[in-house]
Design a protein with these regions (language model features):
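Conserved RecA-like helicase ATPase core segment
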Residues: 214-219
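Structural motif
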Residues: 9-11, 41-43, 203-213
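A short acidic-Thr-Gly-centered motif at the start of a beta-strand
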Residues: 23-31, 191-198
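Short active-site oxyanion
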Residues: 34-37, 202
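Basic/charged alpha-beta structural segments of nucleotide/phosphate-handling enzymes
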Residues: 40-48, 53-198, 213
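N- or domain-start disorder-to-order transition segments that initiate the globular core
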Residues: 1-26
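Conserved phosphate-coordination/catalytic loops
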Residues: 8-16, 177-185, 209-210
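Short glycine-enriched loop/turn motifs at secondary-structure junctions
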Residues: 31-32, 61
């Protein structure tokens, strides 16, 4: 995909700068940005940009048809389309169910010194921690299996990643039994796609200078 940099100044807001780029002075109404995806750093930045675009179009006596204005990781929602990706509540519930006290005692790489009583609160905290670790790995375009195969990783750490991969496999099976896809798997497979969704021809990174590697691979 072709890349082009645009440098903004310090005298106007980012929303005004980006709206001027998307709707230049020589553009003629009616305005349509349906084929453009704008990535913004926060939801609030997205709201300000939409307002700036609406005001700019209004000054030309028109409106503007918008494409997605989203934060970077919502790009995966576009790529996933109608795929049955599990939401965060389903993922959390299944991880909690998989991390039974009996299974946790078998995962001595992940839990070398588990508490005597692995109650709901402890298992819930452990599940959330592992979900967060997977999300951080996915941001770098990695999975636990990648670290198992990395010879530079300490063997003790490889044991931990091997345990995590084991739990991931069980979670994946449980999700599949309910007809769901693992969102991390969808992220990693989407990042490997060579082309963006056909409905969009332009992606604008507006004030997102430090995007995650997994997002960069998609663009």
């Amino acid at each position: 995909m072709h890349h082009k940099l645009h440098f903004t100044g310090w005298t106007t807001s980012l929303a005004d700068e980006v709206s001027a780029l998307l709707l230049p002075a020589d553009a003629s109404p009616p305005f349509s940005l349906r084929d453009t995806v704008v990535l913004v750093p926060t939801a609030q930045a997205g709201r300000r940009l939409r307002r700036a675009l609406a005001e700019r179009a209004d000054r030309a006596g028109s409106g503007v048809l918008m494409g997605p204005v989203i934060t970077p990781f919502h790009l995966f929602d576009l790529v996933a389309g109608d795929q049955p990706v599990a939401d965060e509540w389903a993922v959390s519930a299944i991880w909690l169910d998989v991390l039974s006290a009996e299974r946790c005692r078998q995962l001595n790489g992940l839990f070398p010194q588990p508490p005597a009583a692995m109650d709901f609160a402890w298992r819930h905290k452990a599940a959330n921690l592992l979900i967060d670790i997977r999300a951080q790995l996915a941001e770098a375009g990695l999975a636990a299996t990648d670290l198992i195969a990395d010879p530079s990783i300490n063997p003790a750490e490889q044991h931990r990643w091997r345990d995590l991969a084991t739990v991931e496999s069980v979670v994946r099976q449980r999700l599949s039994a309910h007809g769901w896809l693992d969102p991390v798997d969808v992220q990693l497979s989407s990042a490997g796609q060579s082309a963006p969704p056909a409905a969009y021809r332009r992606f604008v990174l507006a004030g997102c200078p430090d995007i995650a590697p997994v997002i960069r691979r998609m663009l």
